[in-house]
């Protein structure tokens, strides 16, 4: 065992794994109301709840370096590493070595072990919450206390410290996620919307600030005070544009200018509103009314107390401002996802049909090739049968020619096959000449 492993015994009173006698343990004998019940070993052991580990187990505390090692158990013969002791024992059987080397060094009974986390602030650092599996404590330490993300997804750039988590993520990544314009993929709609808000906020923050509107459109007005803002000679100009360049004290301005300046200040900060001052519907001809007022009351030209300002103030949001609605965006996202899912299903179905057609085509081509081979083989067999038939006919003809008796030869010729080809005839003639020569030699001797 390595030096960085510290074996702690539960018999020590300093550890918190010791269960007091007053605590209720389902595996201890209890006496209530005069009835004594004892759970024997023949009964089925129930699973212990969290916080009550096996009192006979040994508490093992491994260092972070040991927990981050990928292969803990190493074969002495081939130096191959394994994560579990059982895998090492199975591997040792492949080496044809004596049984003594396969046995353990000591015949001491192996006790059950529980593993604690080396991080002091972790819940599993307490022996009461120790983990009973070495692989489990390794995965826990890599997930919670390790910053080394060894496996990174190529689609969403999400890193994982445990390979099993990375493989599980690859099965679902991109199938049911929400992709942003920046390239990130989210599996939850809430996280995706929050990221979209942050991205849009960053874009708005990066845009150059718009200059505040410095002009207010004032249509034809019935009062003389609204038309004499800049100079007294502009009495006949009832409609125009008032340029607001520098702020002026509000006390020396008329009431409609105070309202317009305050609204301009608020609009530049909030919603960029457009301000319009419209006359009342009763004032159909403001020029004629102002001329009559000049003739009848010339002394009231500089007296603003007798003048009345009848204005209609309409405030509307700017057309360039677009209100951001999360609900509409969610509906659009969900609709686009549904369309994308349907398109993906149709694409998968088309690909499957294409693969099936390709497979059927390959099967047909193979059957056609087999049929051609069978046809060629049949033709070869037919040619061979014809050749054998011709050979047999030639042998029969040669046998008939060897018969010396004319009577028997006539009988055989009566039932013989019709005349053969020119080659067969020449062959028969040669056989006849050879037969006659043999007969003459026999008669001569």
From Swiss-Prot:
Annotated Polar residues bias: 32-42, 214-248
Chain spans, region SHR-binding: 188-200
Zinc finger (C2H2-type): 73-95, 115-145, 151-178
InterPro entries the record matches: C2CH-3rd_BIRD-IDD, C2CH-4th_BIRD-IDD, C2H2-2nd_BIRD-IDD, IDD1-16, Znf_C2H2_sf, Znf_C2H2_type
GO BP annotations listed: circumnutation; detection of gravity; floral organ morphogenesis; gravitropism; leaf morphogenesis; negative gravitropism; positive regulation of auxin biosynthetic process; regulation of auxin polar transport
Residues bound to Zn(2+) 2: 180, 182, 195, 199
Knockout consequences: In sgr5-2 and sgr5-3, abnormal inflorescence stems gravitropism but normal hypocotyl and root gravitropism. Slow amyloplasts sedimentation associated with lower amyloplast starch levels. Attenuated stem circumnutation movement. No visible phenotype.
Recorded GO CC terms: nucleus
Tissue: Mainly expressed in the endodermis, the gravity-sensing tissue in inflorescence stems. Mostly present in stems and flowers, and, to a lower extent, in seedlings, hypocotyls, roots and the shoot apical meristem (SAM).
Localization in the cell: Nucleus
Up-regulation conditions: Not regulated by auxin.
A GO molecular function held by the record: DNA binding
Record-listed Zn(2+) 1 binding positions: 153, 156, 169, 173
UniProt feature coiled coil, ranges: 340-397
Keyword entries, A-Z: Coiled coil, DNA-binding, Metal-binding, Nucleus, Repeat, Transcription, Transcription regulation, Zinc, Zinc-finger
Low complexity composition bias: residue spans: 22-31, 281-293
Keyword flag DNA-binding: yes
Annotated spans, Disordered: 22-59, 203-253, 281-314
Zinc finger (CCHC-type): 178-201
Pfam families hit by this protein: C2CH-3rd_BIRD-IDD, C2CH-4th_BIRD-IDD, C2H2-2nd_BIRD-IDD, zf-met
Cleaved signal peptide residues: none
Protein task: Transcription factor involved in inflorescence stems gravitropism, probably by regulating starch accumulation in amyloplasts of graviperceptive cells. Required for stem circumnutation movements. Regulates lateral organ morphogenesis and gravitropic responses. Acts cooperatively with IDD16 to control silique and branche orientation. Involved in the establishment of auxin gradients through the regulation of auxin biosynthesis and transport.
Protein name: Zinc finger protein SHOOT GRAVITROPISM 5
Gene that encodes it: SGR5
């Amino acid at each position: 065992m390595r030096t960085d492993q510290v074996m702690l015994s539960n018999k020590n009173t300093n550890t918190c794994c010791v269960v007091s006698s007053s605590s209720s343990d389902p595996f201890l004998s209890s006496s209530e109301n005069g009835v004594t019940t004892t759970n024997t070993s023949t009964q089925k052991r129930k699973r212990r709840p969290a916080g009550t580990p096996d009192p006979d187990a040994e508490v093992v505390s491994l260092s972070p370096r040991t927990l981050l090692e990928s292969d803990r158990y190493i074969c002495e013969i081939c130096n191959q590493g394994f994560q579990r002791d059982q895998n090492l024992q199975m591997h040792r059987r492949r080496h044809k070595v004596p049984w003594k080397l396969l046995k353990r060094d000591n015949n001491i009974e192996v006790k059950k072990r529980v593993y604690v986390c080396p991080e002091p602030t972790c819940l599993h650092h307490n022996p009461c919450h120790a983990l009973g599996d070495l692989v489990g404590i390794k995965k826990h330490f890599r997930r919670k206390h390790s910053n080394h993300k060894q496996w990174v997804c190529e689609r969403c750039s999400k890193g994982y410290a445990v390979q099993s988590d990375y493989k599980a993520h690859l099965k679902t990544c991109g199938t049911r996620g929400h992709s942003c314009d920046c390239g990130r993929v989210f599996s939850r709609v809430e996280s995706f919307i929050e990221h979209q808000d942050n991205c849009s906020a960053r874009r708005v923050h990066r845009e150059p600030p718009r200059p505040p509107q410095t002009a207010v459109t004032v249509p034809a007005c019935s009062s003389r005070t609204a038309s004499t803002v800049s100079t007294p000679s502009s009495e006949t100009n009832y409609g125009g544009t008032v340029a607001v360049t520098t702020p002026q004290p509000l006390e020396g301005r008329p009431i409609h200018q105070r309202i317009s300046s305050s609204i301009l200040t608020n609009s530049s900060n909030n919603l960029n509103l457009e301000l319009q001052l419209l006359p009342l519907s009763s004032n159909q001809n403001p020029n004629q009314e102002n001329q009559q007022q000049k003739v009848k009351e010339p002394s009231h030209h500089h007296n603003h107390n007798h003048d009345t300002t009848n204005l209609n103030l309409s405030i509307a949001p700017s057309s360039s401002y677009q209100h951001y609605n999360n609900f509409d965006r969610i509906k659009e996202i969900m609709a686009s996802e549904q369309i994308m899912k349907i398109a993906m299903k149709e694409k998968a179905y088309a690909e499957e049909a294409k693969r099936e057609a390709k497979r059927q085509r390959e099967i047909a081509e193979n059957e056609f090739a087999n049929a051609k081979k069978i046809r060629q083989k049949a033709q070869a067999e037919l040619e061979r049968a014809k050749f054998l038939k011709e050979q047999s006919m030639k042998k029969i003809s040669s046998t008939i020619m060897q018969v010396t008796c004319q009577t028997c030869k006539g009988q055989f010729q009566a039932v013989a096959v019709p005349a053969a080809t020119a080659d067969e005839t020449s062959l028969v003639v040669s056989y006849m000449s050879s037969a006659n020569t043999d007969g003459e030699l026999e008669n001569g001797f």
